[in-house]
């Protein structure tokens, strides 16, 4: 069995930890959001890519879901002494990966090839693909003191901590972006696709904004795991951004966002009363992933549902 997972940097990596326990890692492909990629100074950040790499190599800081566990921060502290305002705290070993990526990008090497080098160096057998080698950026339109501002996601979430009146979200350059090498093949060869419980708007939305990817997904069996329970997003600014795009902040809103491509919605058992409002198959189960047992259980239930009921 081969699966493809669409992932951002939080939520979905927890599910990846479950799948990698029950499916041979070589049969798992992950297409990762790069809509949050940005430069801090001269350092290129691809936060979701790095998080997925660290997740597969079992070195992810699973308290923050960013950076490496037990990392040190000598460089960050020294930069502060020099007056450099590095708001995002980057660890020393994490910085090394980012420096490597930056140096190769400056040489003109595509991001997908760099990711292949990095995962190979960490003995990762799963396939990890950036959604595109073209720069597609999530831009957040906010209103502040009567003025409209267009922010990168980093500026919105890290600098402002999501405290803003959000009017809309755009995916800059997505009309011209092409899927990275291997992305469409991974979708085509997979038995089914899982959209993980990442923020639909800024983690999964940029991937779906690339037309060829979305069209390829329409030909597959697609599960979508809701990142919302009741009216409460599990993490991040999901609620604010869903509202800005005109979707209700609940599982019906998640279904509405994915309805063009989803075959099975995976929702928490607490939302069983919403099942009748969802016009596709529904797998209702505990979706909170606090322990590795939780992650494995959710992954197993998705696989078993596919085996028993998905004969589209």
From Swiss-Prot:
Enzyme class: transferase
Keywords in alphabetical order: Magnesium, Transferase
Catalytic activity as recorded in UniProt: (2S)-lactyl-2-diphospho-5'-guanosine + 7,8-didemethyl-8-hydroxy-5-deazariboflavin = oxidized coenzyme F420-0 + GMP + H(+)
Cofactors that this protein relies on: Mg(2+)
Organism domain of life: Archaea
Pathway in which the depicted protein is active: Cofactor biosynthesis; coenzyme F420 biosynthesis
Chain ranges passing through the membrane: none
Binding site for 7,8-didemethyl-8-hydroxy-5-deazariboflavin: 50, 89
Matching InterPro entries: CofD, CofD-like_dom_sf, FbiA/CofD
GO molecular function, one term: LPPG:FO 2-phospho-L-lactate transferase activity
Enzyme Commission code: 2.7.8.28
GO biological process terms, semicolon-separated: F420-0 metabolic process
Described function: Catalyzes the transfer of the 2-phospholactate moiety from (2S)-lactyl-2-diphospho-5'-guanosine to 7,8-didemethyl-8-hydroxy-5-deazariboflavin (FO) with the formation of oxidized coenzyme F420-0 and GMP.
Quaternary structure note: Homodimer.
Sequence similarity: Belongs to the CofD family.
Identification of the protein by name: 2-phospho-L-lactate transferase
Organism: Methanococcus vannielii (strain ATCC 35089 / DSM 1224 / JCM 13029 / OCM 148 / SB)
Highest classification ranks of the organism: Archaea, Methanobacteriati, Methanobacteriota, Methanomada group, Methanococci
Name of encoding gene: cofD
């Amino acid at each position: 069995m081969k699966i493809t997972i669409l992932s951002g940097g939080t939520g979905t990596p927890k599910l990846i930890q479950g799948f990698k326990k029950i499916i041979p890692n070589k049969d798992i492909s992950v297409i990762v959001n790069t809509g949050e990629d940005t430069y801090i100074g001269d350092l290129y950040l691809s936060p979701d890519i790095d998080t997925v790499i660290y997740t597969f190599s079992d070195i992810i800081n699973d308290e923050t879901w960013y950076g490496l566990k037990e990392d040190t921060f000598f460089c960050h502290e020294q930069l502060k002494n020099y007056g450099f305002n590095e708001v995002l705290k980057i660890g020393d070993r994490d910085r090394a990966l980012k420096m490597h990526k930056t140096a190769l990008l400056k040489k003109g090497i595509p991001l997908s090839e760099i990711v292949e080098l990095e995962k190979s160096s960490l003995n990762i057998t799963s396939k990890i693909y950036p959604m595109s080698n073209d720069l597609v950026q999530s831009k957040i339109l906010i209103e502040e003191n009567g003025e409209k501002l267009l922010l990168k996601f980093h500026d919105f979430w890290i600098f402002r901590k999501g405290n803003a009146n959000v009017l809309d979200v755009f995916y800059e350059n997505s009309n011209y972006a092409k899927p990275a090498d291997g992305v469409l093949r991974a979708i085509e060869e997979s038995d089914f696709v899982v959209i993980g419980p990442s923020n639909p708007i800024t983690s999964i939305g940029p991937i779906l904004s690339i037309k060829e990817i979305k069209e390829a997904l329409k030909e597959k069996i697609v599960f979508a795991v809701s990142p919302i329970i009741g009216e409460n997003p599990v993490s991040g600014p999901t609620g604010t951004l869903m509202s800005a795009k005109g979707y209700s902040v609940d599982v019906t809103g998640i279904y509405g966002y994915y309805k063009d491509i989803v075959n099975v919605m995976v929702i928490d058992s607490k939302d069983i009363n919403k099942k009748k409002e969802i016009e596709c198959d529904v797998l209702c189960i505990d979706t909170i992933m606090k322990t590795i047992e939780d992650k494995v259980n959710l992954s197993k239930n998705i696989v078993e549902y596919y085996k028993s009921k998905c004969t589209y």
